[in-house]
Amino acid sequence: MSCKHTSYTKTIILCLQKVKHLVNWTKFQKNRTMKKGILLTLLMMAFAATAQESVLLRLNYNKADNYVTSIELKQSMGAQGGMSMTMFMNSNVSSVNDQSIMLESKVESVVINMNQGGMVMDYDSNKSSEELDQMGQMMKSQFDPILKATIYNSVDRYGNVLEVKVEPSLPGMEQFTGGQNAINFPEEEVSIGSSWESESENQGMKIVTKYTVANINDGMISLDIAGDVSGIGTGTLIGKSTVEISSGVQTNATIEMNLSAQGIEMNLITTSTMKKI
């Protein structure tokens, strides 16, 4: 073998070695980069898991705050007819301390449309007696005292009702406060997937409601609602609700209840909103 050929061979071997070294170095860098990427992804996943937002739900009204609540109820009883009602209520936060919050509320307007057993009844509190038919005038005589009454409602930071007083006193009037903040908050912080239950009794019916956190975003918490009804009526309910985290105000809610009572099947859908004015 000539010296020239030997020199070429050495050069080729040297080049191949350099290429091999370069390939190995490239693989090393690629693997190193991949490992860094995997490590970074794992760290981000771990951070996301530990940094999942948890919130503490409490009522945080301020004295002199004013809120308007709208409640829309649609009731269907199949062939027996149905009813729709829209109500607006204004509430003023009259006092606040560490233990309780006092609200003064007044029903501002009520609109009812009813069709039961072929009998049609319409009532609008914004209309005068002259603008209402005979049935509407009868309903006006029943609702006028309600529109003139003031409801004094005391609640704690968890949303539990401590006391309800109506002036002048009207039986059943306290039921009109039900749509303002019907959620009882848990003691602990909650995050997505958290759930808790509350119980209430209303006119002979016991309602057990389960709230599950569906989402937390932009200062709001979204809840899925499910529940069971027992007592003089039996049934189920489902719905959704949105709560402002900073104030604890239930800004909107939709609840559908299917109820059987005294041989009558009913479907009730209640939609409520509450906003600061």
Name what the model sees in each region.
Residues 7, 138, 143, 253-262:
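A short, charged
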Residues 52-121, 194-277:
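Acidic, serine/threonine-rich low-complexity disordered tracts
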Residues 23-25, 173, 232:
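Short, aromatic- and cysteine-enriched interfacial helices/patches
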Residues 1-57:
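Bacterial Sec-dependent N-terminal signal peptides
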Residues 106, 112-146:
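Mixed-charge, low-complexity intrinsically disordered segments
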Residues 141-218:
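Solvent-exposed helix/loop surface patches that form functional interfaces
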